[in-house]
Amino acid sequence: MSIRVIYPGTFDPITNGHLDLLSRACALFDHVILAIAESPNKKTLFSLNERVDLAKGATAHLNNIEVTSFHGLLIHFAQQKNIPILLRGIRSLSDFEQEWQLCHMNHRIMPELETLFLMPSEKWAFISSSLVKEIAQYRGDVSAFVPDCVKEALLR
């Protein structure tokens, strides 16, 4: 039996923390879908297509990953893909509180949906896309936090 999971998020932009979680997920599961949310209620730096392209570039070294985008509710995307497992990363207690609510709301709507949580490696536990964007906005060096393709995009 092939175990497939969806790792959803905005990924604006994808960071080394995301890549750490993805590489570990690829070792645990047969197929990982990196599902990039349109997120119309969020003000994103990169367009949906740019975020997909950056994620594809950053994950090219991973064999069992598929990068795609989705619109609307994540549970509808999971149903469409026939994948009942979500993978989420938790860096902090505040992440846990938000993920706990989402997990239970999703489960209430789609009872067969399970959410698995992975803690980041200690090296990447403090990184967030928001912090990376703020550092880049003031022309700080983000090379330790993002893959090269993202660094180049942030410098444009």
From Swiss-Prot:
Binding-site residues, ATP: T10, F11, H18, G89, I90, R91, E99, W124, A125, F126, I127, S128, S129, S130
Entry EC number(s): 2.7.7.3
Catalytic activity: (R)-4'-phosphopantetheine + ATP + H(+) = 3'-dephospho-CoA + diphosphate
Residues under site feature: Transition state stabilizer: H18
Binding site for substrate: T10, K42, L74, R88
Keyword Nucleotide-binding: yes
Principal EC category: transferase
Entries under SUPFAM superfamilies matching the protein: Nucleotidylyl transferase
One GO cellular component, as annotated: cytoplasm
Domain of life assignment: Bacteria
Residue ranges of coiled coil: none
Cofactor(s) demanded: Mg(2+)
Pfam family, one: CTP_transf_like
Protein localization: Cytoplasm
Pathway: Cofactor biosynthesis; coenzyme A biosynthesis; CoA from (R)-pantothenate: step 4/5
GO biological process terms held by the UniProt record: coenzyme A biosynthetic process
Main location: cytoplasm
Family (UniProt): Belongs to the bacterial CoaD family.
PANTHER family, per database record: PHOSPHOPANTETHEINE ADENYLYLTRANSFERASE
Subunit structure: Homohexamer.
Reported function: Reversibly transfers an adenylyl group from ATP to 4'-phosphopantetheine, yielding dephospho-CoA (dPCoA) and pyrophosphate.
Name of the protein in its database record: Phosphopantetheine adenylyltransferase
Gene: coaD
